Amino acid sequence: SIRNNITRTTPMTAKTHHYHTRTEWTGNLGVGTAHYTAYSRDHIHRAPGKANIPGSADPAYRGDPARWNPEELLLAAASACHKLWYLHHCADHGITVLAYRDDAEAEMNEAAGRMTAIRLKPRVTISAASDPALALALHHDAHRDCYIANTLNCPVTIDAHIEQA
């Protein structure tokens, strides 16, 4: 496994990107937050020009299990960021990726009030002409460059598997 123990510094000439979202609570059932069980945890995440994402709390906290909760969104962000960097590095190094799937997992310790571990488990299929050892090694570069992993305050481990077509 590759562990998130890389310190990232930003060059002085690096471009700054800005992101804007709106989270709108849609769970007022008529009496607002008059008491703990009087309201729904449902909300909508919005961003200009994008499809809305229905959200709620984890079902353990009275959330709707059919909607994305913040913990799942955080895990999905870590997984997607790693995947995007991995594909970038593969393209740069002549590795042809044909398929990529990550069944990522996260652990949250309620007493600690934070995520305590994220485990990415990418399963990658590469072309027969691609080097599987290099394809595996490029997960380290992707992890090093992943903005989300570099932002998180919990270990992010990578348990990658490479298969040739």
Predicted regions and their residues:
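Extended beta-strand/beta-hairpin segments
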Residues: 4-76, 84-165
